[in-house]
Design a protein with these regions (language model features):
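Extracellular glycan-targeting catalytic surfaces
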Residues: 1-105
Length: 105
């Protein structure tokens, strides 16, 4: 049971970061070249595409009817775009993707 294992947990869990902050260049420079290339290609592809629409009416429809598929599709497209742009900016760290990131947020 979970309750039996709770005493073994520390009072404060250690912080976790799935990747280093963008300014930690040493962390990003250790990525294999193939991974950098893949992340840069994904970011460039997203930056070249128009921003996916996310009208409030989709969320309102979800709130009213409970039908979330259309809102989720639009929201997840934005989230995937943001992840690709942010990762590419972290790899390159030149500011090229910052405007697209700001527009997506």
């Amino acid at each position: 049971m979970i309750s039996e294992r709770l005493p073994f947990l520390p009072e404060v869990l250690p912080s976790f970061r799935p990747c280093p902050p963008a300014h930690d260049r040493a962390g990003w420079e250790t990525l294999p070249p193939a991974a950098k290339k893949r992340l840069m290609a994904a970011g460039a592809a997203e930056a070249a595409k128009p921003l996916p629409a996310l009208p409030l009416s989709l969320w309102l429809d979800f709130a009213r009817t409970g039908k979330r598929s259309e809102w989720e599709e639009a929201c997840f497209a934005r989230r995937a775009r943001l992840c690709a742009l942010a990762a590419a900016e972290c790899v390159e760290y030149q500011g090229r993707f910052l405007d697209a990131i700001a527009d997506t947020v």
